Amino acid sequence: MTLRKIVSGGQTGVDRAALDAALAANLPCGGWVPGDRMAEDGIIPERYPLIPLPNCGYRQRTRLNVSDSDGTAILYNETLKGGTRLTRNLCALLNRPYILISAREIPDPNVAAAAVLKFIEGSGIQVLNVSGPRASGWAGGHAFALQVMGQVIATVQERSVHGS
């Protein structure tokens, strides 16, 4: 298992859940954010080790998080829209591997985590970008992504300890 870092854009919802899961497990995390560190709930707290992009907004941040990672896990609930759709489109444009995890199709976080793990292993992902709707676009997104990514990270760490 090769995962060594989680990145995201720091927005509320799925992005922040991925960072929360990494921080809770002491896995390195980071990513690019707009220069003003703004998210829909205000300034992104400093506990998230994110790099501000001076004079840049959400689109540039999303592009760099896609291009600077080995692959992207997109967790969503209904349809791809807004920044979540942009992430998928940038993955395709930049020929970066990605996996779409629909909570509507895979409501069990353990099953979703298994799919993400298979993607990480199959694509040789060391730096994983995690993206999805902000909190206002999916009320349950943070909780779902926190469970999924928490399980992904726990499994990776357990396997690295046991050498499998």
Model feature map: region roles:
Residues 1-2, 164:
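Classical N-terminal secretory signal peptides
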Residues 2-126, 134, 144-156:
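Acidic/glycine-enriched connector segments
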Residues 157-164:
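Divalent-metal-activated hydrolytic enzyme cores
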